[in-house]
């Protein structure tokens, strides 16, 4: 691999020394950018955009043209896997993702294929290869997948949900059936992420968006257990370099110690967890990513800078911090406020490094 011109993100994940705190944003390529809206209109619909290599590459790179971000992340979706399994993913305005063929019984799970990432999901691999070439070693490229539990919530509910009644009914009344689904998804995610690594991504993130709706015991059994299996199955080195892995469970602040035992390199935090307390709890076992409330970006510059300084101060001196939001950037965020945010992270963390 060519040496990265900016490897601060990778170095921070591996808890190596950095001159500044690296920063990127979940959903950094997306609807808050006017240039994204133009490409989306050109593509027609969301999945058509995801499956068009050139347009998806353009969208992936758009935020890096605007802001001095320290990493790029593939423009894709966690539901590419169930779509490739034949569930018929579609999006409705104002309602989010839905499936034509949701999982309703054990027989539905048994007939699910495990997709070949270089066939049914080749468009994601083509995107990774194309973006790596276009980045030309400027910053690292992040690949990702949803956690098995989170993907399962959409497959069983048939779309988004607030109470997860169908999936939780399966969990309590047919746990073996749910484990069958989670095992199949785990195999699929391992193949999918390893293919992304072979295609050129330099870091992996696993999004466990809905792990936080589980009780502590069920989180360990039905979510964390499978993410642990994924980490054990991943290629952890490619092109002579380590491939760091970040786990992000939204609402998972109470389980940091258990997450740190999975073998991940970093834990993503939402804004409900104090990053200083999190660092105290996990010690030097893992790096931490986060964790500003995305809503702060609605505020004027002095408040954004104050929040950035507060989080940097709470984390304290030393490496192992990747600055991010506690969840994805909101679609109505003013783009100029993102510039204020990114610049503040770099400026204030550089000042800390100089005085540390």
UniProtKB/Swiss-Prot annotation:
Enzyme class, first EC level, given as a word: lyase
Its EC number(s): 4.1.1.37
Subcellular location(s) of the protein: Cytoplasm
UniProt binding sites for substrate: 27-31, 77, 154, 209, 327
Pathway named in the protein's UniProt entry: Porphyrin-containing compound metabolism; protoporphyrin-IX biosynthesis; coproporphyrinogen-III from 5-aminolevulinate: step 4/4
HAMAP family, A to Z: URO_D
Function: Catalyzes the decarboxylation of four acetate groups of uroporphyrinogen-III to yield coproporphyrinogen-III.
Gene name tied to this protein: hemE
GO cellular component, one term: cytosol
Molecular function GO labels: uroporphyrinogen decarboxylase activity
Protein's UniProt name: Uroporphyrinogen decarboxylase
Pfam families in the cross-refs: URO-D
Alphabetical keyword list: Cytoplasm, Decarboxylase, Lyase, Porphyrin biosynthesis
Family recorded in the similarity comment: Belongs to the uroporphyrinogen decarboxylase family.
NCBIfam families noted in UniProt: hemE
Catalysis: reaction(s): uroporphyrinogen III + 4 H(+) = coproporphyrinogen III + 4 CO2
Organism the protein comes from: Hamiltonella defensa subsp. Acyrthosiphon pisum (strain 5AT)
GO biological process: protoporphyrinogen IX biosynthetic process from glutamate
Cross-referenced SUPFAM superfamilies: UROD/MetE-like
SUBUNIT field: Homodimer.
Lyase recorded as keyword: yes
Keyword Lyase: yes
Site residues (Transition state stabilizer), renumbered to this chain: 77
